[in-house]
Design a protein with these regions (language model features):
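Short, conserved SAM-binding/catalytic segment
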Residues: 36-46
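The conserved SAM/SAH-binding core of class I Rossmann-like methyltransferase domains
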Residues: 27-28
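Conserved hydrophobic/aromatic "anchor" residues
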Residues: 7, 38, 307-310, 332, ...
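Class I S-adenosyl-L-methionine
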Residues: 54-68, 73-220
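Non-catalytic DNA-binding core/recognition domains of DNA-processing enzymes
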Residues: 315-382
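S-adenosyl-L-methionine-dependent DNA methyltransferase catalytic core
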Residues: 2-24, 128-131, 154-302
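Low-complexity, Pro/Thr/Ser/Gly/Ala-rich linker/spacer regions in secreted
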Residues: 294-306, 384-389
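Conserved SAM/SAH-binding beta-strand->alpha-helix loop
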Residues: 31
Length: 394
């Protein structure tokens, strides 16, 4: 699929989609430092372009005839404060939508911070997508359940021309891992040498801890990397004494963003740290890319639609709530295959499984409730349990 990357930065999203088999034909970026970094890592052109000048951008992008446009418009202006303000960079979300709806690719993927979905700029963009015939899948993904060793929640709007809303939701939910990926497990998977058991990440407030273990996902990698201050005192939530604990190096942070060690970054440390923090984690991009490929190739989640209709019609669930139930059933099925047990026996087996016990109690309760609903549906419908990805043959 011919793909163009907008607001490409140093290339995290490009690399993720390229790794999933997409043909990246061009990238567009306006930060010269990121452009130079991109050029060192990709063979296709990266074009310096101010994407806020929409008419000029459309002319340039149309030349590449993309089937897919991907991109993460800058998100710094989506304030997290009580009185949320939006500036010029937030408006670039609307620019992205104007470009997409003028170029008219078959699909698009837009990434942003989770709170961007509530912004006025996104609401305008969303209306533009819908008015131009795009069905939308809107979802917040936790990167640690998408093959990234980092707790990073990101909003994705994935559009398909003439597709139904939510066309990719089931596949995205089905492909997520049951357990989050820890730093230790990621290092083991990649055969990296783990030189630390704990590390420092500068807290936004002195009321928060700064020391973290490699046995959990890392907190969100940000655009700055500060060393541990000499005056730092142990926080109540710090797992160990901080005396001999250091911050991650630039390359270690890049690994947490799932950039391979072969990816070349510039020597300017400040620029590099910002590029790393701003990037879409490579394997999160690959996760979304492979999910879209599954859809295009005809692979669909096969939990029959009658179950979803039953949840909405008989139990009063909204579309979103029914989707959450399905997501929890998928999660349970990955731990213990549903087809092997009846309802009561299945819940008992689930309770005795080590990986299920490691999940937070509140989540365990949610999963078991979802499973009970599914078996209740099966009892009255005589349907066979269907909770896998299958190839429909299309």
């Amino acid at each position: 699929m011919r793909t163009v990357d907008l607001f490409s930065g140093c290339g995290g999203m490009s690399l993720g989609f390229q790794s999933a088999g997409y043909n990246i034909v061009a990238a567009f970026e306006n930060w010269s430092a990121a452009i130079e970094c991109y050029k060192q890592n990709f063979k296709h052109p990266v074009i310096e372009t101010d994407l806020s000048i929409v008419d000029e951008a459309i002319i340039r992008i149309k030349k590449y005839q993309p089937d897919l446009i991907i991109g993460g418009p800058p998100c710094q202006d989506f304030s997290n404060a009580g009185n949320r303000t939006e500036g010029e960079r937030a408006e670039l979300t609307h620019s992205f939508a104007k470009i997409v709806t003028a170029v008219k690719p078959k699909f698009f993927v837009m990434e942003n911070v989770a709170r961007a979905s509530e912004s006025e700029a996104y609401k305008k963009a969303r209306k533009l997508f819908i008015d131009n015939g795009y069905g939308l899948t809107e979802i917040v993904l936790d990167a640690s359940h998408c093959n990234v060793p980092q707790k990073r929640n990101r909003f994705f709007c994935i559009g398909g021309l003439d597709q139904d809303d939510g066309f990719l939701s089931a596949i995205l939910r089905a492909k997520q891992t049951v357990l989050p990926l820890s730093v230790r497990d990621y290092y083991s998977e990649k055969k990296y040498t783990l030189e630390f058991e704990y590390y420092y990440r500068h807290p936004r407030s002195y009321k928060r801890r700064g020391i973290f273990s490699v046995d959990t996902p890392a907190p969100t990698i940000r655009g700055v990397n500060r060393p541990k201050p000499s005056e730092y005192k142990k926080h109540d939530s710090d797992p160990v004494d901080p005396s001999n604990i250091r911050a991650m190096t630039t390359r270690e942070r890049a690994r947490i963003q799932t950039f391979p060690d072969t990816f070349v970054f510039p020597e300017n440390t400040a620029n590099t740290e910002q590029m790393i923090g701003n990037a879409v984690p490579v394997q999160l991009a690959t996760f979304v890319a492979s999910s879209l490929s599954d859809f295009v190739d005809g692979k669909q989640y096969s939990c029959n639609m009658q179950f979803i209709d039953w949840l909405k019609g008989n139990k009063g669930f909204t579309n979103r709530a029914a989707g959450d139930i399905v997501s929890r059933i998928i999660r349970a099925n990955k731990i213990v295959p549903i087809k092997q047990y009846t309802g009561f026996d299945y819940v008992n087996k689930l309770d005795s499984t080590k990986s299920f016990k490691s999940i937070k109690p509140v989540v365990q309760s949610q999963v078991k409730r979802a499973v009970r609903l599914y078996f209740e549906y099966l009892d009255i419908s005589t349907k066979e349990p269907e909770v896998t990805l299958h190839d429909s043959g299309t």
